[in-house]
A protein has these predicted regions:
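Short S/T/G/P-rich N-terminal loop/turn motif that feeds into the first structured element of a domain
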Residues: 1-54, 59-70, 94-109
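C-terminal structural segments of small proteins and small subunits
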Residues: 75-92
């Protein structure tokens, strides 16, 4: 089942951030990632407008996406971004339909 790496970012230092983005295409390719959206037009539909760049990458499986994020290559590239060049929130989402039977139980609430 496909999975999607969704990242929201705010670039603080474009020159340093570019050191990160220059390395990313080869890393995504190594792990089978396909960029579906990167930096295009967007509209905040709900919530605060904190970020100004969005990226969506598809992987064949959830595990491939997580392996990419946790890889030494990605960690090395992300160090440029994490050193103050940008602020990012990333989530890996497995594709599919979240039917009531697949949602977490609310027991004990």
């Amino acid at each position: 089942m496909p999975a999607y790496w969704v990242a929201r970012s705010r670039i603080i230092d474009p020159a340093e951030y570019k050191k990160y983005t220059d390395r990313i295409p080869a890393i995504f390719a190594k792990y089978g990632g396909r960029v579906l959206a990167r930096g295009g037009r967007f509209q905040i539909m709900e919530g605060p407008e904190k970020f100004h760049r969005f990226v969506v990458v598809e992987f064949d499986t959830f595990e491939q996406g997580v392996a990419c994020f946790q890889s030494p290559e990605y960690e090395e590239a992300a160090a440029f971004r994490r050193n103050g060049a940008g602020e990012v929130e990333t989530v890996m989402v497995e594709g599919g339909d979240a039917t009531p039977s697949s949602l977490p139980s609310r027991a004990g609430r």
